[in-house]
C-alpha cells in the first residue's frame, strides 16, 4: 500500500514537471488536471474499512481483504473484522 502511494506521488510530481511550450501547453494542462484529480482522490480516500463486501470478491480484492481479517460473512456479505 505504501509503495503504491509512493508511485502515485512520484507520478503526480512527474506530471507536474512536464511543462511545455510550442503547442504542448494543452497536454500539460490536461496532465495538471489529472494530477490534481489523483491527489484529490488520495486526500479524500476512505480510511474506514469497507462496510460490505461480496464474499467471493473479498478474497480477490486486495483492499477488501486487508480489512477483512476475520473473513467475509457469506450470508450477510458483511466484511467481518477482528
UniProtKB/Swiss-Prot annotation:
UniProt entry keywords in alphabetical sequence = Disulfide bond, Neurotoxin, Secreted, Signal, Toxin
**Which range is the signal sequence, renumbered to this chain?**
1-23
The residues of the propeptide are 24-50
Superkingdom of the organism of origin: Eukaryota
Disulfide-linked positions = 53-68, 58-72, 64-79
Signal in keyword set: yes
- Cellular component per GO? extracellular region
The UniProt GO MF terms for this protein read: toxin activity
Spell out the subcellular localization from the entry: Secreted
UniProt comment concerning the protein's domains: The cysteine framework is IX (C-C-C-C-C-C).
What's this protein's family per the entry? Belongs to the Pg turripeptide superfamily.
- What is the name of the protein in this document? Turripeptide IX-23
Taxonomic source organism: Gemmula speciosa
Amino acid at each position: 500500500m505504501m509503495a503504491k502511494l509512493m508511485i502515485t506521488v512520484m507520478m503526480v510530481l512527474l506530471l507536474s514537471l512536464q511543462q511545455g511550450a510550442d503547442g504542448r501547453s494543452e497536454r500539460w494542462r490536461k496532465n495538471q488536471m489529472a494530477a490534481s484529480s489523483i491527489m484529490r482522490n488520495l486526500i479524500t480516500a476512505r480510511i474506514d474499512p469497507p462496510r460490505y463486501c461480496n464474499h467471493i470478491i473479498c478474497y480477490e480484492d486486495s483492499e477488501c481483504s486487508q480489512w477483512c481479517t476475520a473473513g467475509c460473512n457469506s450470508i450477510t456479505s458483511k466484511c467481518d473484522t477482528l
